[in-house]
Amino acid sequence: SAASDVYKRQVLQSQLAYENGRYVIDFEDLEVKLKNPQTTLLILCNPQNPGGNVWSKEELARIGELAYKYGVVVISDEIHCELTDPGIDYVPFASVSEVCKKISVTCIAPTKTFNMAGLQTAAICVPDERLRHKVWRAINTDEVAEPNVFAVDAAIAAFTKGEEWLEQLRAYIYENKQITEKFIKDNIPGVSMVESHATYLCWLDVSDITDNSTRLAAYIRKNTGLFLSAGEGFGGDGKHFLRLNVACPKTTLMDGLERLRNGILSFDR
């Protein structure tokens, strides 16, 4: 939304459908939004944040075909791509088909996986030459095309020498998500964790507790010291959700889960 504000763009959202504890793409709604003659760009989150979906090749192909049909470019935000559960691999949007490749602008960065926020290590991959020139022109116009030397070396080191550490991290985060899901199920009535196979962020359904997650997050923060993200900032049905970061040592996680329980159990509904 920050980018749309800067460039005076109107955002047309195609909300995911929440079904049986997980999110799915509403392709009928997506096509309605894409066929709007004013729609020129689709921003895809792959894997999806905050829901943690790892989109399948078939789902991505269908998105690509629809976007191509209506002349829409797809920016695929793949910043969480390495952070999938063990045994789960994400599918790069541009790899799915020649159609997807032709209309794709893929954004990646070691920022999330290797904790490099602020180093300016983002990269953009644009296979199509004409589209690449447009992107090149835009990032130079905005003067964001010149990373510092430290950022370049840091990104190369992360992508070429970080595999062993990354595999350990993925296993650790997966364990933390399992611990979180079990703790909530056993100790916090009325709260459930959305099925997720990517990211270190848990999306908690608190719809049985409140329809104002901002108020609930503020209450928990004030009364327990636990900082959570209110779901309303993510649009859609976010008013019924909280986002919890579990990329931390297990001792910190357990402390946070106890605070979460105490905050929710004492919350005045």
Feature-to-residue mapping (PLM):
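Conserved core segment of the aminotransferase class I/II
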Residues: 97-174, 182-183, 263-264
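A short helix->loop->beta-strand "cap" motif at the edges of active sites that frequently abuts
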Residues: 9, 69-72, 101-102
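Short hydrophobic/aromatic beta-strand micro-patches
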Residues: 125, 203-205, 245-247
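Active-site phosphate-binding strand-loop segment of PLP-dependent enzymes
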Residues: 16-88
